[in-house]
Design a protein with these regions (language model features):
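N-terminal, charge-rich interaction modules
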Residues: 1-37, 41-43
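Flexible, glycine-/basic-rich loop-and-beta segments that form/coincide
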Residues: 9, 134-147
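Short, glycine-rich nucleotide/cofactor-binding loops
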Residues: 57-67
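Conserved Class I S-adenosyl-L-methionine
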Residues: 98-119
């Protein structure tokens, strides 16, 4: 599905040739658009578990408490220059969530991550792209500077 913009979802998420991508808790409905080799750019390596490093991480989350627990390890996966997409159900979706863009920012910003893009994934999911602030990119990833 090209979504609202007409662009392929892989392009909207910044998944380019040769990238390492982690798709975490990918909903079954999105498998045809992200989870199959035929739709991905050439040479993309896909992982389904957290850990290690990745150029792009797309994490589907429905609970703020779970995001709080996972934001540190997820941020470390994309340090220093990758992109972390946090996807959550839209308000109009039938999926239950306590997440909004405001909650994602409240969790991410104090830890050194800043949002720079938003993506309408499909009719049920929206996502915010987080990257490390420029001043954090030169050293080591802050493990969890707020808590």
């Amino acid at each position: 599905m090209a979504g609202y913009s007409g662009s392929p979802l892989t392009r909207k998420l910044g998944i380019g040739e040769g990238a390492t991508v982690a798709l975490l808790d990918l909903p079954a409905a999105l498998e045809p658009e992200l989870g199959t080799v035929s739709v991905l750019p050439s040479g993309v390596r896909v992982r389904r578990r957290a850990g290690g490093t990745a150029d792009v991480v797309v994490a589907f989350v429905t609970a703020a408490a779970r995001l709080e627990r996972r934001i540190g390890p997820l941020g470390a996966m994309v340090f220093p220059a990758g992109g972390l997409w946090i996807a959550w159900p839209k308000r109009a979706s039938s999926l239950v969530t306590d997440l909004t863009d405001h909650v994602v920012r409240e969790v991410a910003l104090p830890r050194g991550l800043v949002d720079n893009k938003v993506c309408a994934v499909d009719d049920d999911w929206t996502a915010l792209r987080l990257v490390w602030r420029v001043e954090h990119r030169g050293g080591t990833a802050p493990l969890d500077p707020v808590r």
